[in-house]
Structure formats: structure tokens, C-alpha cells
């Protein structure tokens, strides 16, 4: 176990694009911790072995696509968010056991808290998409007391599956319902790849949204997605997706290294610069 001191990882397949090492290694340096956070490209067929073996070399780590659901099945104990969402993105060791958690729900809410405090008051939320990211967002919204959450997906059965998982306060809708849903939406959340570099193109008419509405996108490449650009042009308040990435990293770092780091403008600048350099 001595080899594992002050080492953490992010594993995925592929994983070279991950900005998590930029975030965690910045915090390690900032807090004077002699440690490392590194990328591990683990193919799906090797993931089970990696989970069994990582405690020999690491204190814990993060899990990204395509391993989040597999990690959920393999860990010994899960936190409430991971249990509900059905996916694990953070691993740590406790009393010799491998623990799993999901910090995406925390990251989503913390990002909005920092940018637009009070966002959850009297909110009516419309969530675009019904994948894993949508599950984390809906969990965050429900945990903040929002009881009118509309899940919209091109395949309505997937939206219904989200509703079945969360029960009360959620409803499933077809994509064609978006114009009607927006008329009383106070928080619009995009969890799809719409507007992402390399993702599908598309346009959502935001004219029906109330002037007081907030529009947020979990996509952060590009930072200003077409959806956010349209919202800003209408004078609506917007929140980009980079903050979710930054904030979701906080709980894991604290568990592994014993210090709760802060998300600061300086950290954001560093990650934005890294994103720009990687274009």
C-alpha cells in the first residue's frame, strides 16, 4: 500500500482528452502535496482487473466513459448519488474496501450556485437528453427541491426510463414538445451532444422562454455552444459547462488528499488555456 500514497488517476477509453489531470495537478501544486494524478487508458475487457488491482498503486481515482456503469457494478459500496444514478465516477478506499460515488450531481449544482446563486428557487426545469448526464442533472435538481422537471428526448422511451427511475416530479416528453414546454421553463439544461465539437448540429428556438429564464449547457467544448450563444443574444442568463467539470473534481480530491480545494477564476483560466491549446 505504500506505493499508493498520494497517487490518483482517471481511467477511461480513450482518456487522452481528459482535462482532469490539469485540474488535480494544479491543486496538488497549490497545496504543496507531493503526489500525482494521471491518465490510465483502460480497455473495457481490462477494467475489472484494473479495479481489483488499483489499491496497490493508488489512493483512488476517477472513472469516465465507457466505464461508469461497470464501476457501479464492481465497487463494494456506493454513495446515495451513485446508487440512484446507476453510475460511478469517483473511487476511493475506506477500511480496505473500494467505495464508489458520483460527483457529477454535486458538480452541476455547485456550478450554478457559483454563477447564479438562488437559481433553484421556484424553478421549473426542462432537461434536454436522457442519457447518463441527464440522470446526474435530474438527481441534482430533485436534491434541490425542484418538483417540476421535464425530460425531453428524441426517443421518448428513454425519457420515460429516466422518469421511472426518479418517480415523482418528473415527466417525459418528445422533442416536438419543446416549444410548448419552454413557455414556462425557468431553467433549461442541455445534456445532449448538440453543439459539441464533432457532435450533431441543430437549432432550438428559444423565443418561447420567459425573459427571466436561465440556460445552461453541460458541454464545454466549445465553451460558448450555439445554444448558449442564442440565449445570450436574447439577453438570457447563461452558464457554460466547464464549471461542472471543475466542481465535480472537488469531492474526489478531498477524499484522496485530505484537503478541500477551491474552484477559482485562476483555475478556470488554466483549464481554458489548455482547451485552447488542444484545439
Swiss-Prot record:
GO BP annotations listed: amino acid biosynthetic process; aromatic amino acid family biosynthetic process; chorismate biosynthetic process; shikimate metabolic process
Subunit field text: Homodimer.
Pathway: Metabolic intermediate biosynthesis; chorismate biosynthesis; chorismate from D-erythrose 4-phosphate and phosphoenolpyruvate: step 4/7
Stated name of the protein: Shikimate dehydrogenase (NADP(+))
Keywords on record: Amino-acid biosynthesis, Aromatic amino acid biosynthesis, NADP, Oxidoreductase
Recorded family membership: Belongs to the shikimate dehydrogenase family.
Entry's Gene Ontology cellular component terms: cytosol
Active-site residues annotated for this sequence: 68
Role noted for this protein: Involved in the biosynthesis of the chorismate, which leads to the biosynthesis of aromatic amino acids. Catalyzes the reversible NADPH linked reduction of 3-dehydroshikimate (DHSA) to yield shikimate (SA).
Molecular function per GO: NADP binding; shikimate 3-dehydrogenase (NADP+) activity
Binding site for NADP(+): 80, 129-133, 153-158, 218, 241
Binding site for shikimate: 18-20, 64, 89, 104, 220
EC code: 1.1.1.25
Enzyme class: oxidoreductase
Catalytic activity as recorded in UniProt: shikimate + NADP(+) = 3-dehydroshikimate + NADPH + H(+)
Amino acid at each position: 500500500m505504500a506505493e499508493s500514497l498520494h497517487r490518483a488517476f482517471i481511467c477511461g477509453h480513450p482518456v487522452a482528452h481528459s482535462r482532469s489531470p490539469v485540474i488535480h495537478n494544479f491543486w496538488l501544486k497549490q497545496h504543496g502535496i507531493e503526489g500525482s494524478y494521471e491518465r490510465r487508458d483502460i480497455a473495457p475487457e481490462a477494467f475489472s482487473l484494473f479495479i481489483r488491482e488499483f489499491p496497490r498503486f493508488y489512493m483512488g481515482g476517477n472513472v469516465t466513459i465507457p466505464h461508469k456503469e461497470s464501476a457501479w457494478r464492481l465497487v463494494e459500496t456506493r454513495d446515495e448519488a451513485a446508487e440512484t444514478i446507476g453510475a460511478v465516477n469517483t473511487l476511493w478506499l475506506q477500511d480496505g474496501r473500494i467505495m464508489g460515488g458520483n460527483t457529477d450531481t454535486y458538480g452541476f449544482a455547485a456550478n450554478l450556485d457559483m454563477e447564479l446563486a438562488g437559481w433553484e428557487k421556484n424553478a421549473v426545469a426542462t432537461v434536454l437528453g436522457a442519457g447518463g448526464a441527464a440522470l446526474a442533472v435530474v438527481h441534482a435538481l430533485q436534491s434541490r427541491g425542484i418538483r417540476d422537471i421535464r425530460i425531453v428526448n428524441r426517443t421518448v422511451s428513454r425519457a420515460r426510463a429516466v422518469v421511472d427511475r426518479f418517480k415523482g416530479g418528473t415527466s417525459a416528453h418528445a422533442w416536438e414538445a419543446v416549444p410548448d414546454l419552454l413557455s414556462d421553463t425557468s431553467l433549461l439544461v442541455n445534456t445532449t451532444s448538440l453543439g459539441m465539437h464533432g457532435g450533431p448540429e441543430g437549432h432550438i428556438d428559444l423565443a418561447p422562454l420567459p425573459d427571466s429564464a436561465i440556460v445552461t449547457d453541460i458541454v464545454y467544448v466549445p465553451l460558448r455552444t450555439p445554444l448558449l450563444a442564442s440565449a445570450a443574444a436574447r439577453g438570457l442568463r447563461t452558464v457554460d459547462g466547464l464549471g461542472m467539470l471543475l466542481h465535480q473534481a472537488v469531492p474526489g480530491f478531498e477524499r484522496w488528499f485530505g484537503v478541500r480545494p477551491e474552484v477559482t477564476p485562476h483555475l478556470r483560466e488554466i483549464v481554458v488555456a489548455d482547451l485552447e491549446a488542444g484545439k
